[in-house]
């Protein structure tokens, strides 16, 4: 499609509704006479039943809420004309209502978006008509025909109810000249067939986008699960390494403790043996000195004994009258000894 759907032209709407050019606010002469002419019009379809069910649920919810007292006829006339007294103030939208409207416009499960409803029914929706996505049927003041794909904008000024809900006729209530149909729609100039094709294409694109989103979410979920498994495996390996390291460290610490104990015992033995060695060495040195002293003393005793013996023999020879010869003189060992 090269062109956007700009809505139905004014001539097509007048041809379908049966309203003449000069009489916008006038009703057809006969409702029954207009039905056969409108039934043969091609391309007009009933709105989905889902929207009707939503409208019925909305009516029930509004009826269950605490209803305000019934307005008097003069107040109803003021409501029709769209004017209000200076003392009356229009209701101000609350933040909760604005949040509900914003959340409703983002709902992907809805059959029609707000912009599409505005294009089909009212063109650019005014602030008076922007209440909820299905507030085109007001249970308190209006009861309009919701079975037509076309809807002449009447807002709150439509007070007469339609007796034929299954008819394809649009709403035939009286409208003021200033509330004429707004045909400035973005889908103006495109037939219903092209609009249906465009709608189906948009729905197919939305389905493809949803499928792509679901696939992306599934891939992200699978990727996250795989990363979680990898992280869990890494944690398991790290815990295993830490446990093996703890076992090895405990074993080595035990061996080191045993080696320390053995080293202490050997060191004690070494110190003891070293002390014994020093003691034995000292004893050996003392014994050697004592041996030398005793040997020297023995030699001295022997030498002195020989000297005394020689002197005694000399004295005895002199008493006898023998003279000792030179050869028999005693040898002084003390002089020869170094």
Curated annotation (Swiss-Prot):
Keyword Coiled coil: yes or no?
yes
Any idea what a deletion of this gene does?
A: Viable. Loss of daughter centrioles and asymmetrical mother centriole-derived basal body results in defective nine-fold symmetry of cilia in neurosensory organs and therefore motor coordination defects. Plp-associated structures are also disorganized but ciliary structures are still present in the scolopale rods. Males are fertile, whereas female are sterile. Results in failure to duplicate centrosomes in embryos and diploid larval tissues.
Query: Which portions of the chain have biased composition (kind: Low complexity)?
Result: 60-73, 153-167
| Annotated Basic and acidic residues bias | 1-14, 46-59
Q: Where is this region: Necessary for interaction with Sas-6 and essential for homodimerization?
A: 260-286
Stretches the record annotates as Disordered: 1-109, 127-188
The answer to whether keyword Transcription regulation applies is no
Family as reported in the entry's similarity comment: Belongs to the GORAB family.
What is this protein's name? RAB6-interacting golgin
**In which organism is this protein found?**
Drosophila melanogaster
Q: Which gene encodes it?
A: Gorab
